[in-house]
Amino acid sequence: MSRRDVVLTNVTVVQLRRDPCPCPCPCPCPCPCPVIRPPPPPPKVEEPPPPKEEPPPPPPPPPPPQIEPEEPKEAPPPPPPPPPPPPPPPPPPPKPAKELTVGINGFGRIGRLVLRVCMEKGVRVVAVNDPFIDPEYMVYMFKYDSTHGRYKGTVEHKNGRLVVDNLEINVFQCKEPKEIPWSSVGNPYVVEATGVYLSIEAASGHISSGARRVIVTAPSPDAPMLVMGVNEKDYNPGSMTVVSNASCTTNCLAPLAKVIHERFGIVEGLMTTVHAYTATQKTVDGPSKKDWRGGRGAHQNIIPSSTGAAKAVGKVIPELNGKLTGMAFRVPTPNVSVVDLTCRLAQPASYTAIKEAVKAAAKGPMAGILAYTEDQVVSTDFNGDSHSSIFDAKAGIALNDNFVKLVSWYDNEYGYSHRVVDLLRYMFSREK
């Protein structure tokens, strides 16, 4: 070890010093002299430095002054929700067409006669739809008619179209109204003559496929009912896209009831229609679960039946709602029917006064709708008559001045078809 060695022990520094021998002799140590050397002084042990005192931790910051929480203020009421946006405006109705065009759905009795009447009155038919009849068969069915005779013009088919008096008519064979491409033939007014699509929802399939308006040729459960000469002015082009032309019997009864009620007042009444048989009946006895009597042979029987025609008058003449009801007898004749209206009058009137009131209406505001006759007529005399109602002055009777029976004839096919076309033209005139 050198003269100065430093030993680090437990972090304590000890310094050792070796002094020379105190012996006076010059010999090298160890010295042989007997001199007793004093023991070396104990090594100085340095005291370890006192540990450094760590500075005391800083005093914690004084707590923030406690702020007493403010009493919660009542929250202001939330602002009212914004008003709901207005509903989108309805789609604008199609622009008025320059010419009335007609489509016919269903080429049965009424469908074919509507086409005949359109040809007579110069109304252009652009399409006929019937899934069960092809153009060749349409020619035959339109040309020959056992009740109204042979069509006097020309009828043929060409390139899949029906051609009547050189007018080409498109033929479609779609099963559902929504499938018929009415938009491809110029958005016509559609005559719904199948007897199937009677409600607004069912008939609106025509609208979705391009029809401008729809006239249902039967009473409807919910469509507005319009009878020419009675309430056609109730037609609203802005809201009515599907309307009903009511039934042939309602078209006969309503004009007569309107005249009598406006002039004398009807307290109550019962109607009976003696009605020609129709295609819904059986030629011989057959099954008819809903109407057992209706299943009996039409040519062999007088068959009592129900009808809603009298009650329907209350829909077109609201003042008579609940005052009329009626029934029908189906009889073995192919066409022309007759209404018997038995009613109690509010104002006493002679039968002569009643006849004069009906005669004046037939010559005036109801000309072409209501007719008057004093001839000794029978049903076939009115086959092909275009009026809705022909008052038979010689057939009616009166019990007294307040209780009368009134009789009026109607061609339930041809007269009704004329009213369908008249309603088409009236509705079209309201769009201009």
UniProtKB/Swiss-Prot annotation:
Q: Where in the cell is it found?
A: Cytoplasm
Keyword NAD in annotation = yes
Instruction: Specify which residues bind D-glyceraldehyde 3-phosphate according to the UniProt entry for this protein.
Output: S247, C248, T249, T278, T307, G308, R330
Q: What is its main location?
A: cytoplasm
List the record's Gene Ontology CC terms alphabetically.
acrosomal vesicle; cilium; cytosol; motile cilium; sperm fibrous sheath; sperm principal piece
What ranges does the record give for the region Testis-specific N-terminal extension, renumbered to this chain? 1-97
Listed EC numbers: 1.2.1.12
Keywords carried by this UniProt record: Cytoplasm, Glycolysis, NAD, Oxidoreductase, Phosphoprotein
Q: Which GO terms describe its molecular function?
A: glyceraldehyde-3-phosphate dehydrogenase (NAD+) (phosphorylating) activity; NAD binding; NADP binding
**Site feature (Activates thiol group during catalysis) residues:** H275
Q: Which reaction does it catalyse?
A: D-glyceraldehyde 3-phosphate + phosphate + NAD(+) = (2R)-3-phospho-glyceroyl phosphate + NADH + H(+)
Tissue distribution of the protein: Expressed in both head and flagellum of epididymal sperm.
Show the active-site residues: C248 (nucleophile)
Q: Quote the biased-composition stretches of kind Basic and acidic residues, using this chain's numbering.
A: 44-55
What is the recorded function of this protein according to its Swiss-Prot or TrEMBL entry? May play an important role in regulating the switch between different pathways for energy production during spermiogenesis and in the spermatozoon. Required for sperm motility and male fertility.
Q: What does the UniProt entry state concerning the protein's domains?
A: The testis-specific N-terminal extension mediates tight association with the cytoskeletal fibrous sheath of the spermatozoa flagellum, possibly via interchain disulfide-bonding of Cys-33 with sheath components.
Give the protein's recorded name: Glyceraldehyde-3-phosphate dehydrogenase, testis-specific
User: What species is this protein from?
Assistant: Rattus norvegicus
Q: Which gene encodes it?
A: Gapdhs
